[in-house]
Amino acid sequence: MRIDIGAALDATATPGVPPDALDRLDDRVAHAHDRITAGMDGDEFGYAALNLPRTVDVDAITAAADAVADADTLVTVGIGGSALGAATLVDALGDDDLDYHALDNVDPAHVTRLLDRIDLSTSAVHVVSRSGTTAETLANFLVVRDAMDDAGVDWTARTLVTTGDDGPLRALADTHDLPVLDAPRGVPGRFAALSTVALPAAAIAGVDVGELVAGAADGRAALAGSLEDCSAYAYGATAYALDQRGAGVNAMLPYAERLETFAEWFAQLWAESLGKDGVGQTPARALGATDQHSQLQLYRAGPRDKLVTMLRPASRPDCAIPEAELADIDYLTGGDLGALLDAEFEATAASLAASGVPTVRVEVPAVDARSVGRLLFDFEAACVLAGELYGVETFTQPAVEWGKNAARELLRGEDPLPETETHIVE
């Protein structure tokens, strides 16, 4: 991953990071790297995510995927990190012949519409819950299982499970002798894309999982004790420094349709990991060039509270723009859609810089397995580094757990929710 933080420095941006402040911050980056390295060496909770390129069993994942490789449709049943990683990998790299869906919400209209539309007899289902107790995942899977039963489909032959050692999902899998992959120990779901949580979906979708993991291993090998020597740390440190100076929003803007879901994955990673103790940078999601026509106005002329992260691949497929008899479009005809999209990228970067909006440019070689594996690993490492600089517990999510527990109690008719003031207008 190659990043350019020049347009985030104070010579261009407001807010911007002074070079001397970046130099001082690099001392903290060195200490943070030592802590991260120690956490990795001890395989500590959370830090173990950065060991996945070494510990993940690609052969076991590939073998599990091969059992349902004949599927025309794949449904991931999970939520949050148990679904976003798979969706990111399949959307970025998956075979176009596979009809892919992530059931990551319990909206009855959506669930029933999906199950009515797909051919369940040629579908594979991957159920993912690290704890095995996730209410939304269990509920959706029970609905899917019932639909397969009603359709006369042997759901046990079409289902793969990833979960922990205990919990209702593990018990169900054991009861019905379902194939089970162990969720990685000590790895929160949002950091588990490069594991049994998401890689099975990628493998079923025809992705070279070995190359994905190799790309992640490249990122692990590139970790170093200075932001000047490590692109992942440079990103995490710059985002942190800008937040400290008022850029409390981080807009992820990929210029590739296949990386649109990556922006969703990034949003969970950044928000759930860093949003604690009254600090954290709020992620926003956009897509270039589409959202130049919806959000760019705000980025350039709205509040000076944003970092814009612009992401693109260095190479793209060819798609020529034909000649036409229309006037005043000579700059288009005979060109290429990729060249047009890259021109939009460059023009947007220049327009943001001209307006003083802090911008970081991120470039990967291509949207291929090795590059995407490196991209995911590097942003995970950037997030861990930022968490060390913020001084937060990067790998927990207590605010989320409160809501989960309250929902369970509400459904069981136990403790009522605390009363809140209402002001209803109809």
Swiss-Prot record:
GO terms for molecular function: carbohydrate derivative binding; glucose-6-phosphate isomerase activity; monosaccharide binding. Keywords: Cytoplasm, Gluconeogenesis, Glycolysis, Isomerase. GO terms for cellular component: cytosol. Catalyzes the reversible isomerization of glucose-6-phosphate to fructose-6-phosphate. HAMAP family: G6P_isomerase. Belongs to the GPI family. This is Probable glucose-6-phosphate isomerase. It comes from Halobacterium salinarum (strain ATCC 700922 / JCM 11081 / NRC-1) (Halobacterium halobium). The lineage of its organism: Archaea, Methanobacteriati, Methanobacteriota, Stenosarchaea group, Halobacteria.
